[in-house]
Amino acid sequence: MANMSPTKNPIPEQDPNVRNKNFEEVALGYTVEMAVDEANRCLNCPRPACMSGCPVNVKIPQFIACVREQDFKGAYHKILEDSSLPAICGRVCPQEKQCESKC
């Protein structure tokens, strides 16, 4: 990864005209291709500053490496090593102000 792509993949969301009639998840999540493309943005820093921005101390580079290899089960287990509530943290974490801002 010589240079990180500055362009983030936006997370697909339900259309507002659809979601105003249901209580389903707004964020639809990435496709496999989008997740891998997003993981490929990581620079693999020798001293990853992103981890200093994570209050839960998730091993972000290892998590991203699993996603890059499409090992989503491994990525999930990597997060579980440090966070017992990954689904909740994933919804409320302002990653753009924490880990991503350190990158």
Predicted features along the sequence, with ranges:
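Ferredoxin-type iron-sulfur electron-transfer modules and their immediate structural context
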Residues: 1-102
